[in-house]
A protein has these predicted regions:
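Long, intrinsically disordered, low-complexity segments
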Residues: 18-19, 188, 273-275, 280-310, ...
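Conserved, well-structured interaction surfaces
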Residues: 81-148, 176-184, 193-204, 453-458, ...
Length: 587
């Protein structure tokens, strides 16, 4: 019987056996082959571990980003990811299953390499072991924040995920333990990441785990453990600062310039000084219709490829415009916030001047309106007009425009719907193409890496996040001066002259959260950031979602269900998450 290291996982990492079969399955390697010549085998083994991350990163993004408030979808969808958007949690969701399966495959492969190789043989072997510890710790962290409740809510009582570090010696008599607690899962995460930090001495670029990647992830992990602004955990906040210091002070990474930030998605990771760790993708992995089904394919249509059915939310666009209007029109292009460059409205051709605004259609639904603009002889917008048809009769209705900020072409308009007469502000702009009834504000932050396509290497850690981690942790410790310096480092890069003059207990939470939203949008962070700080997710903006719904951090739906197939296949008890608020443990 030949023991082999396989790239398969069914509910738990299994070391399979093959009797009388000399040819090993694809992605497998004989254990004796590895131990006899580890350096010759390591590349193939490590490639297998990283390959799991590529498949895992797709549902990882959708679980984290779609449950937030940075995007909207054109309409209801039968795709399983719509449950992430709607918070209609079910345990039978194939995308959630993929997130679980491919993550645990990565954990299994990393664990088996750790078990098979001894430390101290060479710097290269130690570094590879460190990469395995990093990947395992990182995956457990991404799991515990998705399936386990926020750390500030009774972490010793609430359940995290099963700790399955490799294959049992006796695979014929398996009895796996139930899910570890949230606290125990975090302990595993920290143990793995610290071991990774210790072992890794070779930096092979952002496509591979490194000492800096381990320190960056530890900074985030401790931030997640640092409590809320109202009740900070002063044991863990200093550790978030400590590990952020290690990354920032290492000199191994640098923030890109404002001009480069506007082109950030197009920079290949190995040429990007801000990138710490990414799940590296290459062009040969994206061919033909693959561009439709990658993450970027839902956000935009580029070169005729991509569904382009998810758009930047009005809430996110308002945040971008908060310090000044971002103008995407070709003839007057101006980005007040550099991060607005990741949004690309689809203007119709030839251009048609309109005023665009949002009104309540009824008591529960908001929607966009785009009306043609009429200018006077001096070129000043004076009214908007709309053609309404009742039966066979067409009537033109005109609406006076009042300047709110003429320089930025912001005007107020009084408009009537069945909800009543409403006076709102709108932008003079060109008409944006509609998908159903929603303007197509394409998102390109997950596309165009090195080419005009949807090629994208999902970001796990980059330097800007580390500055914001340190800002938040220092604010929770009452060190507002230090927090302000870091906050303004990121804000001032994106918005010329946009730095804050002060930061204190009255505004730190709002300002730091805002900057994390702006800077880390479309990196699968937003929903977790809201809930870990005890916030409430609100989506009071146009879209087919429930616009009146509010999801507080105490809700049972802030975490995902354990996939039912995983429960069914698990060799032991695998407890499901609560199915209503009565089962939620908060303290």
């Amino acid at each position: 019987m030949k023991k082999i290291l396989t790239a398969t996982f069914a509910a738990a990492a299994l070391l399979t056996t093959s009797c009388g079969v000399d040819r090993l399955p694809y992605g497998s390697m004989a254990a004796e082959q590895v131990t006899a010549d580890p350096e010759a085998s390591l590349d193939a083994l490590m490639n297998g571990v990283y390959a799991q991350l590529k498949t895992w990163s797709d549902p990882m993004h959708r679980c984290g980003e779609y449950a937030g408030d940075n995007m909207m979808i054109r309409g209801n969808s039968t795709d399983a990811f719509f449950e992430f958007i709607s918070f209609s949690r079910t345990p039978n969701n194939y995308r959630l299953q993929n997130f679980w399966d491919y993550g645990y495959k990565g954990i299994a492969q990393a664990s088996n390499i750790i078990a098979m190789l001894e430390e101290g043989q060479s710097a290269e072997i130690d570094n590879s072991l460190g990469e395995c510890y990093y990947i395992r710790g990182m995956l457990y962290f991404y799991f515990v924040r998705a399936y386990g409740r926020p750390y500030y809510q009774a972490p010793e009582k609430n359940l995290g995920v099963p700790i399955v570090n490799g294959t049992p010696e006796n695979i014929n008599d398996m009895a796996f333990e139930d899910r570890a607690t949230v606290a125990q899962t975090y302990e595993q995460v920290i143990s793995d990441l610290k071991k990774a930090e210790e072992l890794m001495t070779i930096d092979k670029g952002p496509g591979f785990a490194s000492k800096g990647a381990a320190q960056a992830m530890l900074s985030r992990v401790y931030l997640y453990m640092s409590g809320t602004y109202e009740q900070p955990n002063t044991q863990y906040a200093p550790l978030a600062v400590e590990y952020a210091d290690k990354v920032i002070n290492s000199g191994d990474y640098a923030l890109v310039s404002r001009a480069q930030l506007m082109e950030y998605p197009t920079i290949v990771p190995e040429n990007n000084p801000e990138a710490i760790f990414v799940v590296k993708r290459i062009a040969s992995e994206f061919v033909g219709y693959d561009h439709y089904y990658g993450v970027g394919g839902m956000y935009a249509n580029i070169g005729g490829m991509g569904w382009g059915e998810m758009f930047a939310s009005a809430k996110y666009i308002d945040l971008l415009n908060e310090t000044g209007r971002n103008d995407w029109r070709e003839e007057s292009y101006k980005m007040v916030d550099a991060r607005a460059a990741f949004i690309e409205p689809v203007y119709v051709s030839p251009a048609r001047e309109v005023i665009r605004f949002i009104v309540w259609d009824n008591a529960t639904t908001q929607n966009y309106v785009q009306l043609d603009v009429v200018r006077d002889a001096a070129g000043v917008p004076v009214k908007a007009k709309e053609t309404k048809k009742v039966g066979e009769t067409e009537t033109t209705v005109e609406y006076p425009l009042t300047a709110v900020d003429a320089d930025q072409e912001i005007y107020s308009i009084t408009y009537t719907t069945e909800f009543g007469k409403q006076t709102v502000n709108g932008f003079i702009d060109n008409y944006i193409n509609l998908n159903r009834v929603y303007p197509e504000f394409y998102i390109t932050k997950c596309s165009r890496e090195g080419e005009d396509s949807h090629l994208h290497s999902p970001v796990i850690s980059r330097l800007a996040e580390i500055y914001l981690n340190r800002a938040e942790a220092n604010a929770k410790l009452g060190k507002y001066g230090d927090a302000l310096t870091d906050l303004n480092t990121i804000r001032g890069r994106a918005i010329v002259g946009g730095e804050y003059e002060s930061l204190d207990a009255s505004n730190a939470a709002e300002r730091i959260d805002k900057e994390r939203t702006l800077e880390l949008a479309y990196q699968a962070e937003r929903s977790y950031d809201v809930f870990r700080n005890g916030g409430t997710l609100t989506r009071h903006y146009p879209g087919p979602h429930n616009q009146a719904q509010e999801i507080p951090a105490t809700e049972y739906r802030v975490v995902y269900y354990i996939p039912q197939n995983a429960i069914n296949a698990y060799p032991g008890t695998l407890t499901q998450n609560p199915t209503d608020n009565a089962g939620v443990i908060l303290n």
